[in-house]
Regions:
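Active-site nucleotide/adenylate-binding loops and adjacent lid/helix of ATP-dependent enzymes
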Residues: 13-20, 25-36, 85-88, 128-211, ...
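Short acidic, glycine/proline-rich loop/turn micro-motifs
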Residues: 43-47, 182-184, 321-324
Length: 351
């Protein structure tokens, strides 16, 4: 296989010049369209319609080495989607969850499936369940997987005094959204005054309710999930997240830390722990009806019991956690990861 040399940057990868001579390669007779992520009109807000963005040009340069026809497509209207269907690509590579066209909401992966076009991630119903942290936790509980006690609180419906079903301290974060948005040094609250303040802050900044849950004091892990293209079986890729203590002495994976990329991921070397994390992650992914790829976050309590935190069925495909899980556990580079994901998309539709 011809390799593209890549250089790691803050947000992902860029191409490096290579002196490798050109090698003639027989390409796979498949057509792939990479959808360009729509530019947000509200860059500071949470874009629920987007699961992840990618460097479309880099993805194209990787895929064109293996597949005969690879193109980048911008979707701005329902008519653009209809034209895509007429072109009938074998696979659409996209991090878009849904489009809003004149008040018509179209979930991309379901639309593609209805038109017999392969895609790389999960269905509309499952993405909706995953993005709402409370719904996801309810599904996890029904599957008899351990997760922290929690409740949803709306700032505009919050009574002057109410009793929590769990003792302080508690952890507070937005009900929807990923990438630790809304998580900061004030997310661990120890009394009712702090709780109300944090809930109101989340409502003001993200226009959504808060999920309040038991604070877990132990280590945090993330587990990448990739399906085997031949059998459909799940491969779990655990990694421990090394987090520095904040001013309060807590190890909180907050938005600022993720944005500045100051946390570290390391391989889980303890076999027993590896298997426990892998088992919980695979069961969680299955319960949430994930497809092809995903990421499950797990945190220990003070008794070293693992708890499901949340799931991401459309994990970022730049240089983030999912890639690092693949690199640590499978010893593959970014190019190989992208090719596996595409092969998954083309193959899993037949399983």
């Amino acid at each position: 296989m011809v390799r593209i040399l890549l250089k790691k940057t803050g947000r992902g990868f860029v191409l490096k010049n290579s002196m490798t001579p050109h090698i003639t390669q027989i390409k796979v007779n498949k057509s792939i369209e990479i959808l360009k992520v729509p530019v947000s009109k509200h860059p500071k807000g949470y874009n629920d319609h987007i699961g992840f963005d990618v460097d479309e040009r880099l993805i194209k340069k990787i895929l064109i080495m293996r597949y005969q026809k690879v193109s980048i497509t911008t979707i701005q209207s329902k008519n653009d989607l209809d034209k895509l269907v007429l072109r009938k690509p074998d696979l659409v590579f996209s991090g878009v969850k849904y489009f809003n066209f004149k008040k018509e909401k179209i979930w991309l992966n379901d639309f593609l499936k209805q038109n017999n076009i392969s895609h790389i991630t999960s269905s509309a119903k499952d993405l909706q369940s995953e993005s709402n942290k409370s719904i996801a936790k309810d599904i996890i509980r029904k599957a008899k997987i351990i997760t922290a006690n929690s409740l949803v609180v709306y700032a505009n419906k919050m009574p002057k005094s109410f009793a929590l079903p769990m003792p302080f301290p508690v952890f507070v974060k937005p009900l929807i959204g990923g990438n630790s948005k809304g998580v900061d040094e004030h997310s661990v609250v120890t009394n009712s005054t702090e709780l109300k303040k944090k809930i109101k802050d989340i409502q003001k900044k993200y226009n959504c309710a808060s999920i309040v849950e038991t604070y877990l004091r132990g280590k945090e892990y993330t587990v990448g999930i990739m399906q085997d293209t031949v059998t459909g079986n799940l491969i779990a890729l655990p990694a421990e997240i090394i987090i520095e203590k904040n001013k309060q002495g807590q190890r909180i994976l907050d938005f600022k830390m993720k944005k500045e990329n100051t946390e570290e991921l390391i391989k889980v070397s303890d076999i027993k722990l590896f298997n426990v994390l892998a088992d919980m992650a695979k069961k969680s992914f299955t319960a949430l009806k994930g497809r092809s790829i995903g990421r499950i976050d797990i945190r220990m309590n003070e008794n070293f019991i693992p708890h499901f935190i949340e799931a991401n069925l459309m994990p970022g495909l730049r240089g983030g956690y999912f890639y690092r899980c693949c690199n640590l556990n499978l010893n593959i580079n970014y190019q190989e990861m992208i090719l596996r994901i595409v092969n998954n998309g083309l193959t899993l539709s037949k399983i």
